Amino acid sequence: MTKLRVGLLFGGRSGEHEVSINSAKAIATALSASENATKYDILPVYIRKDGCWQAPDVAQQVLESAQPLSTPTDKSPQLWQFPPQVNQVDVWFPILHGPNGEDGTLQGLLTLMQVPYVGSGVLGSAVGMDKITMKTVFAKAGLPQVKYMTLSRGQIWSNPCIFPKLCDEIEETLNYPCFVKPANLGSSVGIAKVRSRSELEKALDQAASYDRRIIVEAGVIAREVECAVLGNDNPKASVVGEITFNSDFYDYETKYTDGRAQLLIPASVPDSIMTQIQEMSLAAFAAVDAAGLARVDFFYVEKTGEILINEINTLPGFTAFSMYPQLWAATGISFPQLVDRLIELALERHQR
């Protein structure tokens, strides 16, 4: 049987570069497992932090070391070229997190290449990345959410006379605590929990340095639960998992530092709540036009039984600590089986 050449694409220019490397390393291990080794050949392709694509031999070194490649100090303009091996790929497995990886830009390039790839297309990826657009789509789908406000960088930076009034409006509408987030970053990068006017002003300035679109959400006392989705037109939802942590909120350091957060799988919730979360996950998946895979995050207000959708991640992490593969393992699909199924789904979607 002829093996499929899987282009494992990782790295990238976002702040989640290191997460991408760790995810790619785990996927490469799963693709090399006995049940997959006879089906797939891995062709790793690494994108350096400056956006330069690196050939498989260099990419393999990065996978083995799990360390980013240093970028040249020479900043003179260069014309990046794809490694020639790119033309040998049968199916792409992109595992780039954040901007320029899961926001539709890379998906557009792969679509132009006319080669199958794992995950959502341009639309689903773009909607899933931009928190403001995502929330608009969720509202249209009738999915309940926390109260929020949207802002622009121009509102925060352009007129110092308007800024105090903007903060007044946030305080009156959302109160404290609230969360300030850049609209287009993942892994909690740039997010701040604020409890006072001074913290709010600082957080808004910080978020504006990351993105020109900012969202501010009301804080809610709730359990944080997540559900994984797998499939294309008839997707399935996994068991529900819960994240517990000792830090102030589920920030970048807590997410990716061993021992800082605990994943409880399955979550200890009533069966009716489990079913409702699964149904809402599938509704969110359809609403953004996702494909292949996604992880959907919720707030479960135990006191009232209310379930509020937080966000959908169309290219969730695949590190040793990541919720997505662990949810499917608890549902009965091992890591090697999961990556195999994702490749099958990519091929199916491409043939439609």
Curated annotation (Swiss-Prot):
Query: What is the top EC class of this enzyme, as a single word?
Result: ligase
Q: Where is the ATP-grasp domain?
A: 135-344
Any one biological process term the GO annotation gives: regulation of cell shape
Q: In which pathway does it act?
A: Cell wall biogenesis; peptidoglycan biosynthesis
Task: Give the CC-aspect GO terms.
Answer: cytosol
Q: Which cofactor does it need?
A: Mg(2+); Mn(2+)
Membrane-crossing ranges are none
Localization (cell): Cytoplasm
- UniProt xrefs under InterPro entries: ATP-grasp, ATP_grasp_subdomain_1, D-Ala_lig_Van_CS, D_ala_D_ala, Dala_Dala_lig_C, Dala_Dala_lig_N, PreATP-grasp_dom_sf
List UniProt keywords, sorted A-Z: ATP-binding, Cell shape, Cell wall biogenesis/degradation, Cytoplasm, Ligase, Magnesium, Manganese, Metal-binding, Nucleotide-binding, Peptidoglycan synthesis
Tell me its EC number(s), please: 6.3.2.4
Task: Give the main location.
Answer: cytoplasm
Enumerate the residues binding Mg(2+) 1: D297, E311
User: Could you tell me what reaction this enzyme catalyses?
Assistant: 2 D-alanine + ATP = D-alanyl-D-alanine + ADP + phosphate + H(+)
Give the matching Pfam families.
Dala_Dala_lig_C, Dala_Dala_lig_N
Q: Which sites bind ATP?
A: 171-226
Q: How is the cofactor bound?
A: Binds 2 magnesium or manganese ions per subunit.
Q: Which domain of life is it from?
A: Bacteria
Where does this protein hold Mg(2+) 2?
E311, N313
Alphabetical list of PROSITE patterns matching this protein: ATP_GRASP, DALA_DALA_LIGASE_1, DALA_DALA_LIGASE_2
GO MF annotation terms: ATP binding; D-alanine-D-alanine ligase activity; metal ion binding
The cross-references to HAMAP family, in alphabetical order and at most eight, read: Dala_Dala_lig
Family to which this protein belongs: Belongs to the D-alanine--D-alanine ligase family.
The free-text function statement in the UniProt record for this protein reads:
Cell wall formation.
Record's protein name = D-alanine--D-alanine ligase
List the lineage, top down.
Bacteria, Bacillati, Cyanobacteriota, Cyanophyceae, Oscillatoriophycideae
Q: Coding gene?
A: ddl
